[in-house]
């Protein structure tokens, strides 16, 4: 769909209901960090003696806190293993995410257009806030958000 059509669709929604703010998730909404996420999972699982599941199985856990994703993939609920997995994942993926994560087509234009319309924008994610900010800065859109909130900024990143 051409950018103009996407903006027209958004413009209709924004003018029909005067939104004051829009909250975006990052993964698969604004951007895609799949290569670094897959690398982090592969490394973390390998370090704990688990085979890496296929990429689609890992993708289905994106958006959950890492410890929960680990348990979904392995069945292991041991809190020590879950914390170790987080540390291994972060070691392998964090630096790569800034470089490898990309914005989805039209995301930058949409964020700028919403800003021109006076709509405040926030991005919320289970990613660590510093990782998320690094990605947004590297992609040149950090200034498009009034609020950046990572999973480490809250006590329960996926409340019921």
Region spans (language model):
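Generic low-complexity segments that are intrinsically disordered, proline-rich and/or Lys/Arg-biased
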Residues: 3-4, 9, 52-54, 80, ...
């Amino acid at each position: 769909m051409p950018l103009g059509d996407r903006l027209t669709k958004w413009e209709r929604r924004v003018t029909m209901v005067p939104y004051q703010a829009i909250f975006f998730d990052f993964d698969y909404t604004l951007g895609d960090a799949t290569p670094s996420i897959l690398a982090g999972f592969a490394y973390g699982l390998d370090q704990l003696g688990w085979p890496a599941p296929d990429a689609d199985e890992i993708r289905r856990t994106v958006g959950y806190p890492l410890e929960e994703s680990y348990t979904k993939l392995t069945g292991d609920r041991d809190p020590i293993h879950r914390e170790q997995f987080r540390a291994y994942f972060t070691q392998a993926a964090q630096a790569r995410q800034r470089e490898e994560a990309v914005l989805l087509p039209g995301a930058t234009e949409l964020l700028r257009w919403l800003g021109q319309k006076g709509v405040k924008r926030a991005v919320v994610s289970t990613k660590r806030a510093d990782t998320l900010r690094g990605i947004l800065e590297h992609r040149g859109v950090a200034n498009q958000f009034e609020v950046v909130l990572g999973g480490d900024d809250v006590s329960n990143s996926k409340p019921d």
